Amino acid sequence: QVFEKQFKKLNPGHEGEYLQVFKDIKKELNDDDLGRGFYNRLKSVSPVKLIDFENIKNNVFHFTAEFTCKNGQDEFRPDITLFVNGLPLCFVEVKKPNNHGGMVAESSRMNRERFPNKKFRRFINITQLMIFSNNMEYDALGGIVPIQGAFYCTGARSSAPFNCFREDNISQQKIAPFHQDYVYKDIN
């Protein structure tokens, strides 16, 4: 419903193509290309666009908890799924601080169970960013193994490394420009 409405809004003169584009996307998501076909469609603006990158306010953003990704008997439910114009483009897995196994367990689950499972291919192909956090300071054993903190990865066939979110202070200022310009607000 959201996808259809946004497609028609962003593509005047192409409203009648909505259903065919939707079918094409569903087909592309089953391809064994790590989502390359879908990504190319996503960033394209011709002949139709799925996201308005020029005017972000023309897009609709939603999120939900425990969105089920199911194919046959196989399923997984990311803790949080983020949607842009009705497309589930990002998911977030959040763990309790000091959870057993830390982020190593989550990395293993993704790399051993989800990425290699062909039934999950369509979900991995549409997901542009995966975020994992246990709301703790970084500990990555010298950058080798993600133990705790917030990490991200993108789709893979069998194994994707977890990467740290870092804002470099290239100018060596007392307060990094990112933190100065975008002050974090207390959520308590």
List each language-model region with its residue ranges.
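An alpha-helical interface "stripe"
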Residues: Q1-N188
